[in-house]
Amino acid sequence: HRSRISAGWGDVATIIPWQHYMAYGDLRMLERQYPSMKKWVDYITSQTENDLWSKGNSYGDWVFFSYADDKDGRSAVTIRPFIQQCFYAHSLDLVVRTARLLGRTEDAAKYEALHKRAVDAFRNEYVTPNGMLVSDTQTAYTLALMFDLLPEAQRAGAAKRLVDNVNRYGHITTGFLGTPYICEVLTRFGYEDVAYELLLNKKIPSWLYPISMGATTIWERWNSMLPNGMVNSNSMVSFNHYAYGAIGDWLYRWAAGLQEAAPGFREIRIKPYLNDHFTSMKAEQRTPYG
């Protein structure tokens, strides 16, 4: 239903076909899904004003870290229009790449122009001349860096602000949309030590906190169970959810260092990012080539 269209969720229309292509190197998925990829970005484009996607009822950075009694504004709120613009630009970029692969030259030119306008609008609306973002959150810097939305000269500074934010809180604060990318962004910009600190933190909120509470599945919330063993009183509590399990992607691709250097792993790059906390690490990747 159009009233429930949400950035990040709806963008599976572009993200999944592209990831499938990168994993298997099979253009048929892109060929089959190309019409729906275009329909998604065309619809979002129809909802923009001045190239900004700010309409709608997006979920935002779902279940990000927040304080119950937030009198000093420390909850990690990333404004929803910011997130929407990030994913709008990202989906446009994926459609451009797909159009080029499929030989749709007119489409590629059309969506490339839209992508440039979306990025320019993002920078004008949400980035200060000094590279600060309107939402000073881990998710904001993560998405802006992951999707290459900042000018090259501002990216290193933004990565440093992301690290400063992590150090200021002492833990992760991202929700569903920032969590899949934060450790990758940190590693790409030379802060893999900070990514490992997030991975190995055992205090709430963290990946290892649920394990310390006996969890054998991924929770929907960082604090679905409280330290006293009581279930979170929030009406929406799931003890078997997918989102924060996205750290597994970073473990394979960055910690163990198994990445495709060409679609379908026709070429593979092996570059582990090591850490003193591990004496060994083992991983394997099944590909169309073995």
Report residues per predicted region:
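Active-site acid/base region of carbohydrate-active enzymes
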Residues: 1-4, 8-11, 23-86, 99-146, ...
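Well-ordered alpha-helical segments within folded domains of soluble proteins
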Residues: 7-19, 81-96, 137-148, 175-187, ...
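Long, charge-rich low-complexity segments
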Residues: 16, 25, 143, 190-193, ...
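Generic, well-ordered alpha-helical scaffold segments in large soluble proteins
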Residues: 16-23, 40-43, 47, 91-98, ...
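Flexible loop/turn segments at secondary-structure boundaries
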Residues: 61-64, 182, 205-207, 277
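Non-catalytic C-terminal accessory modules of carbohydrate-active enzymes
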Residues: 113, 193-290
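Zinc-dependent metallohydrolase catalytic domains
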Residues: 120, 180, 280
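Extracellular polysaccharide-recognition and catalytic grooves
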Residues: 128-236
